[in-house]
């Protein structure tokens, strides 16, 4: 196959799609170049599904090679290791809009690999990777209802929406949003914002959808010219005989089971009914069906039952209407020795959230393609199996936990004080102790509460809510505060976090085409109503940050020293600063501009360290009396140390009013004496007097 290249303009960027030159054994491969950012995207699809598989095994791997930025990896092995958090999050970002576009019943394994091979360090390669994924799938012949387009959107009050902003532009942007979708519909939104209105957020989504039509047109042109033949694959026909048989026998019982409001009781009853279905209809004899097929059809009936009830206006699974938030229980200060803690319970979803304050040294060091940087705010989300009443894997966080933690972080990050205002490192951990829908939004609420309990001066409380959608034909229902089952059986997962003034995070995943602007407006409106309700209840428990930090939190003192004095504080090989830290049990961070941050487990420890630093950096003041130590005696006087590293000369004539023949008649090395600073010359030499001390003290110096 000869290489095929397609070039198009995408906003201010020139994008080139090339196939047929690299990775030709993959089912589909495209090299995307977008303003000096190049990403190689490959797609491989298995020709047949594995025996007995009942799920679609799609995997997306986004990887950043350090050579792309002209760097060699750190560490002992000097090669890329496990995926970074950024790589994991981008893999999820690509997965989410493409997964719903594979046909129902398609069980062949598909693997997408996006490799960043060159970057200009000025913009995120994720949009190029998403464009490449769309193109590689479009030319592969694999059943896929694409192509998709993707765009990043920024917002500036004076400029308006910005298409695919650079890192530099994002610094002054009050929005960072990624949108992906097809020609007709938006499928995925991921964003963080600085209290933008619902209308501004919706406008950004629609702006992105209009702009990425250029991507979709270019991918279609590439597929027309270089696409492989479409696979001869047909979706398995629905077994209407089995569907009707199970519905006739158990349909009413399934419907009744979905009126049980307690999750575990409902699951137990549905499990019994599923077992009955298998016992009645599964087997190898004539007229029977495989057990796996019976279970699949039973699940299909569950899906249809719940959806029909909702769109026809019947009460939801737990008896609520479409706009009601589950009952809340909010507690703060629940863990005695932590810096800040909260227990947030919404129905059968519960998060125990803890905030911890640390020193500047506790900040996370991130090694990215753009270089190393520090992150002084971390939010970690843990989802243990006991939260859903199951046994399961324990260990390092999975992709879902990393993604949910990042969403919760986005929700509260805009409300945090700056490092200048509050120079602590902040770590928030959300332990999901019960889960039945929207645990990430419970984490947002719990994080806001825990931060205020810790005394972190957040700008405003933040709450989050998850919305759902069920759409059947022209009928639809937007659901507030969805349950786990409603998430699984619905058509949309729409999460909104924000303050009473505006949105701080919006995440949307849509499983169907045809989500209209009207539906998104209704969802945002209901989310605002629910968010204000939750904030009102949170404010009854704690409405503003505590006036003082927890007594368990480290004390932090700030000061500024002359940058020329930094080496004096650090000492030879770090000896001086190390001695101060060891002796006072405090830690000291010094910036190049002379900013000093001192952290101590107690106020006394921090103050002691501060006094030591002050003593080292202090300058001798003319007319001030010091208590010094005689360091060295010479014929013409004595050198007295009055400050760390600062000696002054007491001339023999300044020792006493009486005539002295030998200095050693009056002074000895190591002797403590009071001295008065007479003068400091332009070379820093200090002239001292002992004999004038008495007169100076008498005059009140």
From Swiss-Prot:
Gene Ontology biological process terms from the UniProt entry: mRNA catabolic process; RNA processing
Keywords assigned: Cytoplasm, Magnesium, Metal-binding, Nucleotidyltransferase, RNA-binding, Transferase
Domain of life: Bacteria
The keyword Zinc-finger is assigned to this record: no
Record-listed Mg(2+) binding positions: 487, 493
KH domain sequence ranges: 554-613
GO CC, one annotated term: cytosol
Subunit structure: Component of the RNA degradosome, which is a multiprotein complex involved in RNA processing and mRNA degradation.
Family: Belongs to the polyribonucleotide nucleotidyltransferase family.
NCBIfam families on file: polynuc_phos (TIGR03591), PRK11824.1 (NF008805)
PANTHER family named among the record's database cross-references: POLYRIBONUCLEOTIDE NUCLEOTIDYLTRANSFERASE (PTHR11252), POLYRIBONUCLEOTIDE NUCLEOTIDYLTRANSFERASE 1, MITOCHONDRIAL (PTHR11252:SF0)
Function recorded in the entry: Involved in mRNA degradation. Catalyzes the phosphorolysis of single-stranded polyribonucleotides processively in the 3'- to 5'-direction.
Name recorded for this polypeptide: Polyribonucleotide nucleotidyltransferase
């Amino acid at each position: 196959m000869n290489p095929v290249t397609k070039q198009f303009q995408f906003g201010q960027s020139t994008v080139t799609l090339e196939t047929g030159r690299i990775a030709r054994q993959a089912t589909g491969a495209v090299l995307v170049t977008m303003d000096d950012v190049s990403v190689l995207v490959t797609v491989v699809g298995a020709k047949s599904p594995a025996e007995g598989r009942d799920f679609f095994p799609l995997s997306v791997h986004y990887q950043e090679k350090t050579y792309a930025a002209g760097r060699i990896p750190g560490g002992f092995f000097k090669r890329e290791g496990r995926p970074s958090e950024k790589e994991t999050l981008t893999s999820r970002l690509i997965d989410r809009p493409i997964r719903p576009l594979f046909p129902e019943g398609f069980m062949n394994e598909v693997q997408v690999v996006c490799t960043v091979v060159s970057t200009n360090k000025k913009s995120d390669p994720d949009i190029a990777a998403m464009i490449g994924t769309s193109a590689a799938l479009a030319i592969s012949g694999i059943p896929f209802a694409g192509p998709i387009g993707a765009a990043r959107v920024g917002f500036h009050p004076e400029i308006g929406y910005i298409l695919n902003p650079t890192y530099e532009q994002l610094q002054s942007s009050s929005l960072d949003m990624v949108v992906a979708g097809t020609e007709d519909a938006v499928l995925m939104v991921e964003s963080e914002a600085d209290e933008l209105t619902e209308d501004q957020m919706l406008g950004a989504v629609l702006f992105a959808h209009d702009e990425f039509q250029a991507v979709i047109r270019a991918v279609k042109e590439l597929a027309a010219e270089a696409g492989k033949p479409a696979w001869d694959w047909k979706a398995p026909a629905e077994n209407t005989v089995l569907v009707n048989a199970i519905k006739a026998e158990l349909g009413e019982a399934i419907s009744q089971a979905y009126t049980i409001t307690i999750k575990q009781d409902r699951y137990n009853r549905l499990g019994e009914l599923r077992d009955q279905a298998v016992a009645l209809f599964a087997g190898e004899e004539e007229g029977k069906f495989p057990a796996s097929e019976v279970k699949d059809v039973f699940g299909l009936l569950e899906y249809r039952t719940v959806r029909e009830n909702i769109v026809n206006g019947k009460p939801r699974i737990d008896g609520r209407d479409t706009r009601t938030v589950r009952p809340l229980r909010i507690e703060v200060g629940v863990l005695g020795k932590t810096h800040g803690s909260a227990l947030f319970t919404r129905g059968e979803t519960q998060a125990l959230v803890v905030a911890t304050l640390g020193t500047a040294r506790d900040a996370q060091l991130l090694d990215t393609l753009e270089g190393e940087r520090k992150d002084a705010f971390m939010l970690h989300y843990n989802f243990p199996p006991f939260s859903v009443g199951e046994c399961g894997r324990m260990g390092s966080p999975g992709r879902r936990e990393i993604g949910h933690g990042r969403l919760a972080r986005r929700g509260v990050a805009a409300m945090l004080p700056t490092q200048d205002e509050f120079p602590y490192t902040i770590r928030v951990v959300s332990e999901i102790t019960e889960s039945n829908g929207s645990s990430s939004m419970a984490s947002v609420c719990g994080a806001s509460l825990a931060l205020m309990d810790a005394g972190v001066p957040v700008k405003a409380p933040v709450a989050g809510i998850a919305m759902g959608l069920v759409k059947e034909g022209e009928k639809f229902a937007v659901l507030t505060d969805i349950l786990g089952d409603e998430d699984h059986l619905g058509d949309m997962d729409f999460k909104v976090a924000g303050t009473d003034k505006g949105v701080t995070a919006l995440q949307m995943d849509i499983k169907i085409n045809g989500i209209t602007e009207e539906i998104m407006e209704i969802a945002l409106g209901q989310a605002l109503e629910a968010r204000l309700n939750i904030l009102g209840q949170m404010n009854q428990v704690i409405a503003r940050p505590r006036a003082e930090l927890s007594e368990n939190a480290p004390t932090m003192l700030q000061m500024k020293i002359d940058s020329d004095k930094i080496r004096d504080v650090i000492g030879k090989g770090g000896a001086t600063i190390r001695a101060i830290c060891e002796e006072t049990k405090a830690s000291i961070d010094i910036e190049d501009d002379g900013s000093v941050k001192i952290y101590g487990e107690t106020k006394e420890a921090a103050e002691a360290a501060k006094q030591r630093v002050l003593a080292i950096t202090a300058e001798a003041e003319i007319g001030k009396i010091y208590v010094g130590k005689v360091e060295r005696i010479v014929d013409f006087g004595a050198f007295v140390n009055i400050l760390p590293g600062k000696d002054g000369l007491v001339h023999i004539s300044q020792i006493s009013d009486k005539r002295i023949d030998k200095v050693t008649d009056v002074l000895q090395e190591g002797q403590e004496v009071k001295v008065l600073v007479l003068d400091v010359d332009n070379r820093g030499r200090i002239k001292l007097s002992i004999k004038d001390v008495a007169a100076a003290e008498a005059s009140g110096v």
